[in-house]
Design a protein with these regions (language model features):
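Fungal secretory targeting signals
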Residues: 1-20
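Sequence-level preference for short, compositionally simple segments enriched
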Residues: 19-337
Length: 337
């Protein structure tokens, strides 16, 4: 009998578990540049705008390409937007890129209106999309959102989000971000009212600044929980990233952010967490907490006195099930493994 070593079996197991999106599901709308097939769309925006304004479930399948322009999802019924990929669990295999260029400095009018992809309705799921706001750096008013989440039960799976300031606006509703890549520098995961859960993601700092800016204004259920993520310096990070990255600062007086089981090779500031601004600290009623942070980025940490290191029992209170009890009704749980 032939024996297989673990090193041989693991790739076979991984291949067996891999899922691919290379053909449109039945009844899906299709986005495919240059296609002459009747009913195909040349842009994602056109496809989304053509969806019926009813409660039906709809799927949009996007073939490889770079698609320019803002996309707004606002219909009442559930929507899945699926990007072509040969491995749906690996964001490095993504082939679909959405690009927009807007910021407050360019006159967009609000944070949300700068977004490349604006999710304005509930029950929207995004798979294997690269979403970019290419505005870049500004001296002021540089808010330039890649993904704006304004609806309930938004799931983001193996997507990549790119900007510099305010990359991800997780603002209203219950949101999950699984096996994705989120890149930015200044307050690049932020919002006011959402409950947001992050697992299996790579979070990449491009320059100095804070990763999160929780804008929680009341003592309500809003929270960001990060579990089993990795924090790195982006491949093209600016030199000022070293020693100038923080896990978060409090945009709102009741900011609440928990990081659990985080691997951090990124060169964080030794205090790990930041006040909002000198003279406007906003730290009296916040929860900035960690459990089991590992890696060179926290090796010499001298944590701020307004932060909390959780015990094992305390950390166990912050799980996907505890903050989103009905998650199995809407989350694609395959991305939790």
């Amino acid at each position: 009998m032939r024996l297989f070593t673990v090193s041989v079996l693991l790739p076979l197991i991984s291949a067996a578990l891999a899922r691919h999106f290379t053909e449109p599901p039945p009844d899906a709308l299709v986005v495919k540049p240059g296609s002459s097939v009747a009913g195909h769309f040349s842009s994602l925006g056109e496809a989304v705008n053509s969806l019926p304004a009813d409660e039906s479930s709809q799927v949009v399948f996007v073939y490889p390409g770079t698609y320019i322009g803002q996309v707004n999802v606002s219909r009442p019924g559930p929507v899945k937007i699926i990007g072509y990929t040969k491995n749906s669990f690996d964001f490095t295999q993504n082939t679909v890129t959405l690009v927009h260029n807007a910021s407050l400095a360019s006159g967009a009018g609000s944070d949300d209106l700068t977004g490349t992809l604006r999710v304005l309705s509930s029950n929207v799921s995004l798979f294997n999309l690269d979403i970019r706001n290419d505005f870049g750096v500004a001296v002021s008013n540089g808010q330039a959102i890649a993904l704006s989440g304004q609806g309930d039960q938004m799931g983001v799976y193996a997507c990549r989000l790119f900007s510099y300031q305010d990359t991800l606006y997780t603002n209203v509703g219950n949101h999950v971000f699984l096996k994705s890549y989120i890149e930015g520098a200044v307050d690049y995961i932020f919002g006011r009212h959402s409950i947001a859960y992050f697992e299996g993601n790579t979070i990449a700092s491009k320059g100095s600044g804070c990763i999160t800016a929780s804008g929680r204004q009341l003592n309500d259920t809003g929270i960001y929980v990060f579990n089993n993520n990795k924090i790195i310096a982006a491949n093209d990070a600016f030199p000022n990233v070293t020693g100038n990255v923080f896990l978060g600062r409090p945009w709102g007086d009741f900011a609440r952010v928990v990081f659990k089981n985080t691997f951090i090779p990124a060169p964080l500031n030794k205090t790990i967490w930041s006040i909002w601004n000198p003279g406007d600290e906003r730290i009296d009623s916040i929860l900035f907490a960690e459990y089991n942070s590992l890696g060179s980025g926290v090796a010499d940490a001298q944590r701020a006195n307004f932060s909390t290191v959780l015990t094992r029992d305390q950390a166990a209170q912050y799980t996907l099930a505890s903050i989103l009890p009905n998650y199995r009704d809407w989350v694609d749980v395959d991305y939790l493994h």
